[in-house]
Amino acid sequence: MSAQKPGLHPRNRHQHRYDLAALCQTTPELTSFLIRTPAGEQSVDFANPQAVKALNKALLAHFYAVTHWDIPPGFLCPPVPGRADYIHHLADLLGETTGSIPAQATILDVGVGANCIYPLIGVHEYGWRFTGSEVSDAAMSSAQAIIQANTGLSRAIRLRRQKDPAAIFTGIIHKNEFYDATLCNPPFHDSAAAARAGSERKRRNLGQNKDDALNFGGQQQELWCEGGEVAFIKKMIAESQTFRRQVLWFTTLVSRGENLPPLYRALTEAGAVKVVKKEMAQGQKQSRFIAWTFMGDDQRRRFITRKR
């Protein structure tokens, strides 16, 4: 039960295989979703979306003190270890300027989602304060319900509705507001058909019947946008220029390595002073995020000093 997962960040709490007994003690409903693998080991029925949701609920309660968490049907149920990795690598990036991870960082989560996952982890692990933007009323209501149901979160997490679905930072970052970083898990498909095909592949890989009533979810704004991930991030890069003095680091996940070259070109054209790529791995899954800033070393130090 102690096999280490390759590639996770050293501070990630999910280095080892899940202690299912402990998780079931924290969240008893998980017990009904346990199965035996062909090798005879106890596991979670990952082909069942309700089981995945129960596992997430248990992980968030056990490791992050989130006692009440739920999402409506049809929304993305995020893998907690991978989301935690982004937060920990972002903490390392923020710590590079001064040599220590900031305890009072303010973070903007672009597309906070119904699950509110990044703020939940970031508040618990580092005491950061989050603003979460969202275009979907249903997702925003879900995230707000999670915040209100857990003591102390309303002081650390605030949500803002993005009224213009074509905008990313505009309308969310207010005048005289400053952020240490933005983060984002962008939509990666370029059409609804591509998103459906991706969901079908995931179901087949997990042995789930196509006609199952439940699937792994994902609303339009979570899964696809015109032009796909590259177009979305290029839009983000273009908009980031307007807020170049209000944000220290802009960051976003990039799902595929082949998407990086056009993004690097866009960053050069936008005048980014420094661009960083952070590679991550969760088991067999490789992922990465890119970060860019319009501030030089001295400017970044002054920004941090002034903001503190």
Swiss-Prot record:
Catalyses which reaction(s): adenosine(1618) in 23S rRNA + S-adenosyl-L-methionine = N(6)-methyladenosine(1618) in 23S rRNA + S-adenosyl-L-homocysteine + H(+)
Pfam families xrefs: Methyltransf_10
EC code(s) of this entry: 2.1.1.181
Enzyme class per UniProt: transferase
GO cellular component terms given for this protein: cytoplasm
GO molecular function: 23S rRNA (adenine(1618)-N(6))-methyltransferase activity
Location(s) in or outside the cell: Cytoplasm
GO aspect biological process, one term: rRNA base methylation
Transmembrane segment boundaries: none
Stored InterPro entries: METTL16/RlmF, rRNA_lsu_MeTfrase_F, SAM-dependent_MTases_sf
The keyword tRNA processing is annotated on this UniProt entry: no
Function: Specifically methylates the adenine in position 1618 of 23S rRNA.
Similarity annotation: Belongs to the methyltransferase superfamily. METTL16/RlmF family.
Protein name as it appears in the record: Ribosomal RNA large subunit methyltransferase F
